[in-house]
């Protein structure tokens, strides 16, 4: 199938320019600059979300790839979750958030199911080949061995729900941790003489920061500081999407209510279109090893988010096939 799309092409590396994409057999076959051409719709690489609990609404927000996420649960729940991952070309695997977390940083996770690191349980999950990311607290006994176990199985060790100090966080990165789950939330903060996990995450260029930029989880100034300190090439916009999101009696937030284009709109207003595409598309795709996604260049898969001039979604394409389209009035 062949299709030509014309509008404002937003590539994380080449920037935003008027042009056209030629799509053939699920791939981007050609890219043509058209100076003076139309600047709507806005065409961006499809968004990739590394932490999403409720993925059904995601394609309507331009999300073309996601990690289906399961939280801290009773024994046996993760196994059943992995057996029933959605049969969806956009599902890139699972993110297991917990249960090896610090109870003092449980946040909205089910504290009653937090438990010590269990190498046998973890190995069972990893043996399915469906787990792409596991979030754990690095200060737990056995956490460093678990980080190595995850990495050797081809997964991404992620750090989160932690009260660790700066040194332990840094050592965990040295051990192989490569992602910070919803940075700032449910983790030790930054102080003048005790920079905590945050200090290590901002400092160390080997780790990617999951930023929930929905306007609820973080103050806008915190979002700004994080992007400016780490740079867009180390930020992956994540949604933690749950329907409906809840505020628990202890004031903790359970999940987010915005994903994909809704996050991009907030970031683009402050950092620009190309930088937003970097954080929403290229960085998470690269972290997952998806070398054919996240850019608008020939040979890449035609996973696209097509937006109007206000960055509201118009259409979502996965491998060149339309999977969602906004109804016209």
Predicted segments, located by residue:
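Glycine-centered positions in the ABC transporter ATPase nucleotide-binding domain
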Residues: 7-8, 25-26, 320
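Active-site-adjacent beta->alpha loops and helix N-cap segments on the catalytic face
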Residues: 75-77, 137-151, 166-167, 190-199, ...
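Active-site gating loops and adjacent loop-to-helix segments of metal-dependent hydrolytic enzymes
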Residues: 45-46, 59-67, 102-128, 170-187, ...
